[in-house]
Amino acid sequence: MKHPLLRPWLTEKSTGLTEKKGQYVFVVKPDADKTDIRNAVEKKFGVTVKSVRTVNCLGKAKRQQTRKGLIAGKKSDWKKAVITLADGQSIDYYSGSAQKGEG
């Protein structure tokens, strides 16, 4: 698969995971599997991936009131991956590079 990583998922919860456990969260393509995600992270950031966990998230149901009545729809389903790196390694989301800790 070509480029399964779409973007980092930056929330309070994901930032806490990064600070406490060294885990990083990415939004990935829905048809990406764990080996594709692992290979993409290792290639893009030059780090060693310890584990990959994925979650399929269902899109929210949306409704909109118009003159003709209620229009029902749904946002697209999406997938996120929680990636654990080897000890002493980190990823800088903003520069797109990896950093290795001392020790």
Curated annotation (Swiss-Prot):
It comes from the Bacteria. One of its GO terms (cellular component) is ribonucleoprotein complex. Keywords: Ribonucleoprotein, Ribosomal protein, RNA-binding, rRNA-binding. One of its GO terms (biological process) is translation. InterPro entries: Nucleotide-bd_a/b_plait_sf, Ribosomal_uL23-like, Ribosomal_uL23/eL15/eS24_sf. The keyword DNA-binding does not apply. Pfam families: Ribosomal_L23 (PF00276). GO terms for molecular function: rRNA binding; structural constituent of ribosome. One of the early assembly proteins it binds 23S rRNA. One of the proteins that surrounds the polypeptide exit tunnel on the outside of the ribosome. Forms the main docking site for trigger factor binding to the ribosome. Part of the 50S ribosomal subunit. Contacts protein L29, and trigger factor when it is bound to the ribosome. Belongs to the universal ribosomal protein uL23 family. This is Large ribosomal subunit protein uL23. It comes from Chlorobium limicola (strain DSM 245 / NBRC 103803 / 6330). The lineage of its organism: Bacteria, Pseudomonadati, Chlorobiota, Chlorobiia, Chlorobiales.
